[in-house]
Every structure is written in structure tokens, then in C-alpha cells.
């Protein structure tokens, strides 16, 4: 897993963008370089119009990957109640439990976390990659500018998810959501550009099975694992039930705590 990439100052960067870029570099330990020092290959971070994005120097025609919780698509889905129809909402068991605290231990770009927040949950995201964590944090920052009530329900912890869950000290966790990165076929048209980039950057999760035991111990009600329909169950552990969608399966593990 790649832990650091350069932060590139855009050629026509504004003072606000440069200030934000330096702040991110100081917090996460990313080296800040000028536009003339932009790498010819590999990944780098940049800020354009106040948005942090991850770019691949070898893919000049591909737009940087960013976390945008306030995108038109996300907000349309929230405003029209689409989130309540999502399989993840059914799997988490939110009917009548909209105020639950959910830990998303594999947040990726945070799309599933935002679905849960949009239906009333409080979500804690745990991310081990400082690069992805920086993108998520920037997404929360920008969401707070327009929708502070939603941003207030999202928090981020940087660290190894299995370890953070094992020693979790926050408020009670009602449910935990796991969506380990699964190796896709190279020619699969279903893998979107950002997921291809993430897989190149982070690889699949070799320790995915290690996430289930601490999750089952921490959650008070259930653990939900998202898997491709063709994938085996996580850690060889048979779920209590499964909810299937067209492309994925949500394995649900009910937790019975004394």
C-alpha cells in the first residue's frame, strides 16, 4: 500500500488553494512540490477550485478522483428518499433505527457512508490509507460548507480498521459495515475508473478476513459484509442471512449481546 504521494501546487493556484494544500501536507506528511516538479508517472494529489483530488500522471485524460458528498447525484438521491430503497439500508436494518451509530470500516470514497448518513445514521469511517483518509476528510470539509447538519454526522478515524475496532473507545456501535476491496478481472467493464485507480494504489485487502472477528465483538446489533455475488463468505463464517442485489450480496451477521 502506498502511504505517501506528492501534493502538487497547480500552475495557476489561488492563495486559498495553496494555503489549503499546505495545511493538508502538514497534517498528513505529504511532500509539497511546485507544478514544475509534478511527477511524470505515478500518483499525486492536487487542489483545484478548493477540491482535493488524486490523479494518475500516466492517465492525463482521466479526471482526478475526489470525494464529493454534495454532488448533484448524491443530493438528488437524498432529497427524493432514494437512500431508503438502497440494499445497504435494508441490510443494516434501519427501519425504525434511523438514528443508529454505524462504523464503516472500509469506506473507500464514502458513498455508502453518505447513504447511511442521508437516512439519519451517524457514521464513523475508519481508513488506514492516509491518502484516502485525506480525500475523505476533504469531502467532509466541503460538505460542511453547504450541509453542516449532514457533515456533523460523519467522522473519520485514521488507522488499521481491525485494530481500531478492537480498541474502539467511542460511543456504542449499533452496526458495522464491511466492503473489502475484491480483486476484479482485468477486463471487467463493471469496474469504474476510480476503483481501478484505487486498486492500483492500494491493492485488494489481504487481511479482509481479520476484520470480521473484531466487528462481531464491537457491534451491538449486526455486521453487514458486502460481497460480489460470486465471492465466498468472509473468513469462512456463515451469515445469519443475506440480501442480494443484481451484482452484490449483503451478508448479515446478527449479534446477540447479553
Curated annotation (Swiss-Prot):
Record's keyword annotation contains Transmembrane helix: no
Binding site for S-adenosyl-L-methionine: 111-112, 127-128, 179
Origin: domain of life: Bacteria
Localization, UniProt: Cytoplasm
EC category name: transferase
Reactions this protein catalyses: guanosine(1516) in 16S rRNA + S-adenosyl-L-methionine = N(2)-methylguanosine(1516) in 16S rRNA + S-adenosyl-L-homocysteine + H(+)
GO terms, molecular function: rRNA (guanine-N2-)-methyltransferase activity
Family note: Belongs to the methyltransferase superfamily. RsmJ family.
Record protein name field: Ribosomal RNA small subunit methyltransferase J
Gene name in the database record: rsmJ
